[in-house]
């Protein structure tokens, strides 16, 4: 048996946890550079605010409907996600983080001691008690059915946030699959939905009843696996350890357009520095660094430009100095004057778990001495707060930094932002 825990309106809910005054109030969270709506509380949804709706369209409504608006506070959201994970791991045999607000839980053996539905309510109540966040729990014999059950928690409020699909309630499974649009099935995207609809497959139940040989021949083994999972045959196991990454990308849209190469250099240094930190967190070494830049594709009155350059490294490295230097060399290849750049990024690839490589006899570049010790010290200094120690090339207060004009406090990651309670 599997359970899927999904935090309701996660970003908006995190903003409410430390603000009791926002209870039952409409809350929305904006994307990078405060561009569009990416999270809505139930109260905000009731006002008709759409996902992806541009901020400028909501700005006037904010005053009329007293909507509380926040910029994305990723440090807070990551911290709260880790708290939820810790609670679930304390109560469950194994947990797989699927996304920042979704976790698969292994329920093997639990049904011999307690009913899955009752255990789901226990999980829900404990997470609410220890983190202040409300979640829905879908329980089923396969991960795909657990996803469908979790979808049902939002459609069937009478189940109080927990829907269990077990062999004992076969009719519930059939009813749910008959109601669920095929496009809502886990792994079925928009294009696949159109193809299935053309064949008369409009619901999850119709997909479950499809011939597996036909699905495999005309679509893929992956969709065949989905059909089997909808019929209760477990084909996708729990992954407690995430698979090793094949690449790391650090990229942001700028708060202000960049026209100066020095400013772009600062941005690339910062992105390369962050990418190197992530690389060390993965315990990997890279042999390829790519820098890319681009203007806005929507600025019709401005010339468009987009380009990328790749730098191959002679030795595998996780040293920020090597990665920053390579990223800046690549920038020199792609930089063109006369453009208003809106985005840049650095991508690391060609990973290896070891930095050991045999240099050529006449190679001028040799491995840096004490590189691992220096990088470990750097990471430890920055562990309690990003940006305590950084490379000078990224500048001190760049104007191009991402706009977050309505950022909430980092209640769980900064000492100065810890909430205070006054008695009396």
Curated annotation (Swiss-Prot):
Cross-referenced Pfam families: DUF4113 (PF13438), IMS (PF00817), IMS_C (PF11799)
Domain UmuC: 2-189
A GO term, aspect molecular function: DNA-directed DNA polymerase activity
UniProt keywords, alphabetically: DNA damage, DNA repair, Plasmid, SOS mutagenesis, SOS response
Matches recorded under Gene3D superfamilies: 3.30.70.270, 3.40.1170.60, 5' to 3' exonuclease, C-terminal subdomain, DNA polymerase, Y-family, little finger domain
A cellular-component GO term for this protein: cytosol
InterPro entries: DNA/RNA_pol_sf (IPR043502), DNA_pol_Y-fam_lit_finger_sf (IPR036775), DNA_pol_Y-fam_little_finger (IPR017961), DNA_polymerase-Y (IPR050116), DUF4113 (IPR025188), Rev_trsase/Diguanyl_cyclase (IPR043128), UmuC (IPR001126)
Keyword Transmembrane applies: no
GO biological process: error-prone translesion synthesis; SOS response
Keyword set includes Cell inner membrane: no
Domain of life of the source: Bacteria
Record family assignment: Belongs to the DNA polymerase type-Y family.
Function description: Involved in UV protection and mutation.
Protein name: Protein ImpB
Natural source organism: Salmonella typhimurium
Gene: impB
């Amino acid at each position: 048996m599997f359970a899927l825990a999904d935090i309701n309106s996660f970003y908006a809910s995190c903003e409410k946890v430390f603000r009791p005054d926002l209870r039952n109030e409409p809350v929305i969270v904006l994307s990078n550079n405060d561009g569009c709506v990416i999270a809505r509380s139930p109260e905000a949804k009731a006002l008709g605010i759409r996902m992806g709706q541009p901020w400028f369209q909501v700005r006037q409504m904010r005053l009329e409907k007293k909507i509380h608006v926040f910029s994305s506070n990723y440090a807070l959201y990551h911290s709260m996600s880790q708290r939820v994970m810790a609670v679930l791991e304390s109560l469950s045999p194994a947990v797989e983080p699927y996304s920042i607000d979704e976790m698969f839980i292994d329920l093997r053996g639990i049904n011999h001691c307690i009913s899955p539905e009752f255990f789901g309510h226990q999980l829900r109540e404990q997470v609410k008690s220890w983190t202040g966040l409300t979640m829905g729990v879908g329980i089923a014999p396969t991960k795909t059915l657990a996803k469908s059950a979790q979808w049902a928690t939002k459609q069937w409020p009478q189940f109080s946030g927990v829907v269990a699909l077990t062999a004992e309630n076969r009719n519930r499974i059939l009813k749910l699959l008959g109601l669920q649009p095929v496009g809502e099935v886990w792994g079925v995207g928009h294009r696949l939905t159109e193809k299935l609809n053309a064949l008369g497959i409009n619901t999850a139940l119709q997909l479950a009843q499809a011939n597996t040989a036909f699905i495999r021949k005309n679509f893929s083994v992956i969709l065949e696996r989905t059909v089997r999972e909808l019929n209760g045959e477990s084909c996708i196991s729990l992954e407690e350890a995430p698979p090793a990454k094949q690449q790391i990308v650090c990229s942001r849209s700028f708060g202000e357009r960049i026209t100066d190469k020095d400013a772009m250099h600062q941005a690339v240094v910062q992105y390369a520095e962050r990418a190197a930190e992530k690389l060390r967190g993965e315990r990997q070494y890279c042999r390829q660094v790519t820098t890319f830049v681009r203007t806005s594709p929507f600025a019709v009155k401005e010339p468009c430009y987009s380009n990328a350059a790749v730098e191959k490294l002679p030795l595998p490295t996780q040293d920020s100095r090597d990665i920053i230097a390579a990223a800046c060399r690549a920038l020199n290849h792609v930089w063109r004057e006369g453009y208003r750049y809106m985005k840049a990024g650095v991508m690391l690839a060609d990973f290896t778990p070891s930095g050991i490589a045999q240099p050529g006899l006449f190679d001028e570049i040799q491995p840096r001495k004490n590189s691992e010790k220096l990088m470990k010290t750097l990471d430890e200094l920055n562990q309690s707060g990003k940006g305590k120690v950084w490379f000078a090339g990224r500048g001190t207060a760049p104007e191009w930094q991402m706009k977050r004009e309505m950022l909430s406090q980092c209640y769980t990651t900064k000492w100065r932002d810890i909430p205070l309670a006054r008695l009396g």
